[in-house]
Amino acid sequence: LSKQMNAKILDTIRRIEANKDFTNPTYMRLLTPHFYEQHICRFPADEWPDPVKRTFKHLNSVIYTQMQGPSEFGIAGNLANWDVSDLLKNITTPTLTIGAKYDSMDPEFMKWMSTQFPNGSYLYCANGSHMCMYDDQQTYFKGLIKFIRAVDKGEKKVVLD
């Protein structure tokens, strides 16, 4: 994702990260429009839905940083080496993974993950980000409702396109 950023802005962000100055107000001032508004929820932050605003307002940064690490451009926290992909085959409940074009998570990885569940299905939101339930609602809810209805009818895998 960093490759998509303006080089000057990315350079400033990298410099702040190299100095471990994550509380620098410039850091969040740059991350908000150039990362969060592009890859988390694709609206200006002041127009984010109320649940998103509340989430960010009440985010426990100590726990988030412990798990993710201080940077949004790589995992350096407790999750850095956490991998349970070999256990996904044991989850037999119909499972839907969702990927989106602008997501901070790789949609191809989400698609791959759906193939690891015995009853996995995948939904791609072509106009969405990490919170595609807000910024690609048509695709997200059409796919989610189709998945729920199919599972309710007893289907294990659902083709969503």
Label each PLM-derived region with a short phrase.
Residues L1-K8, D152-G154:
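The C-terminal output helix
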Residues S85-G128:
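Conserved loop-alpha-helix segment in the C-terminal half of the alpha/beta-hydrolase fold
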Residues T32-Y36, S114, F141, I145-I148:
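Non-transmembrane alpha-helical segments in soluble domains
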Residues N119-D161:
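Catalytic active-site module of serine/aspartate enzymes centered on a nucleophile-bearing elbow/loop
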Residues Q4, K8-K89, T93:
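Alpha/beta-hydrolase
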Residues A18-F22, S104, H130:
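Short histidine/acidic/glycine/proline-rich micro-motifs that form metal-
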Residues L1-S2, M110-S114, Q137-Y140:
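Short, glycine/charged-enriched secondary-structure capping and boundary segments
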